[in-house]
């Protein structure tokens, strides 16, 4: 398990599934909207559904820098385990929600917990891999995000076969169980652990937060990368959140025109 040649790839494999769950759990709500709005009538309003999507994204975006700061100062293993456990518990709890407000606040909590994962996960992978394999390792990990989006798209199919409550419950249980698996198999890089201990014992090695932020904002490369990721995210998230609803409405419209929609 601790073999230096094998274990870095085990880390990628372990975190690949976490990345899958990270994006799958957030995507399920948009695909199951039509099933959920039967029981929670507020979801029939596009405005209310937009609020659910927005609260997650605003909190996720605002928390991401804080998540990076936290990941630099604590054990990333336990940060990953904790965030996975919390957002999986939130997913499980959504299956018991029967009001819009309950879904809204659970969605907000999901934004906080899911934001904690990506900085810690990528940092842990970067620590376990050298320059020759680091980009490949990160690239493989990123495929987990897209696999999660794709699988989350089948939430409506599962909800139709069982119920949206059951769908949330089972996907939540999977994440909770996997968090326990990570406790056993995921390891922190010892070199990083030594740096963290040194920071706690030698205060002079700590970089003041304000100074670090100033250096970051003064780096032109930071702004280029920020714009590079922000530009496709604007239409990307609109598509992810609203495409299932738009597709359903267009399909129903076409069926009605052709007289094929089962009334």
Predicted features by range, described:
Residues 2-4, 191-225, 249-250:
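Juxtamembrane intracellular "pre-TM" segments in multi-pass secondary transporters
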Residues 10-44, 239-244:
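Extracytoplasmic
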Residues 141, 145-190:
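Helix-loop-helix hairpin linking two adjacent transmembrane segments in secondary transporters
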């Amino acid at each position: 398990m601790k073999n230096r040649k094998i274990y870095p790839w085990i880390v990628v494999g372990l975190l690949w599934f976490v990345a899958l769950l990270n994006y799958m759990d957030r995507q399920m709500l948009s695909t199951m909207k039509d099933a959920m709005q039967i029981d929670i009538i507020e979801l029939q309003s596009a405005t209310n559904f937009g609020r659910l999507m927005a609260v997650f994204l605003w909190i996720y975006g605002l928390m991401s820098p804080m998540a990076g700061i936290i990941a630099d100062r604590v054990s990333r293993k336990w940060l990953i385990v904790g965030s996975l456990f919390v957002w999986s518990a939130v997913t499980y709890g959504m299956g018991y929600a029967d009001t819009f407000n309950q879904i809204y606040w659970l969605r907000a909590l999901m934004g906080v917990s899911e934001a904690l994962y990506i900085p810690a996960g990528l940092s842990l992978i970067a620590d376990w891999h050298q320059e020759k394999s680091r980009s490949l390792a990160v690239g493989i990990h990123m495929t987990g995000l897209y696999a999660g989006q794709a699988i989350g798209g089948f939430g409506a199919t599962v909800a139709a076969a069982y119920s949206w409550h059951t769908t949330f419950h089972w996907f939540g249980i999977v994440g909770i169980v996997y968090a326990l698996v990570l406790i056993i198999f995921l390891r922190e890089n010892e070199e990083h652990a030594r740096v963290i201990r040194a920071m706690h014992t030698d205060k002079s090695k700590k970089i003041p937060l304000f100074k670090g932020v100033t250096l970051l904002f003064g780096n032109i490369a930071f702004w280029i990368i920020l714009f590079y990721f922000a530009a496709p995210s604007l239409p990307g998230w609109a598509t992810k959140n609203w495409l299932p609803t738009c597709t359903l409405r267009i399909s129903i419209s076409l069926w009605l025109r052709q007289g094929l929609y089962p009334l």
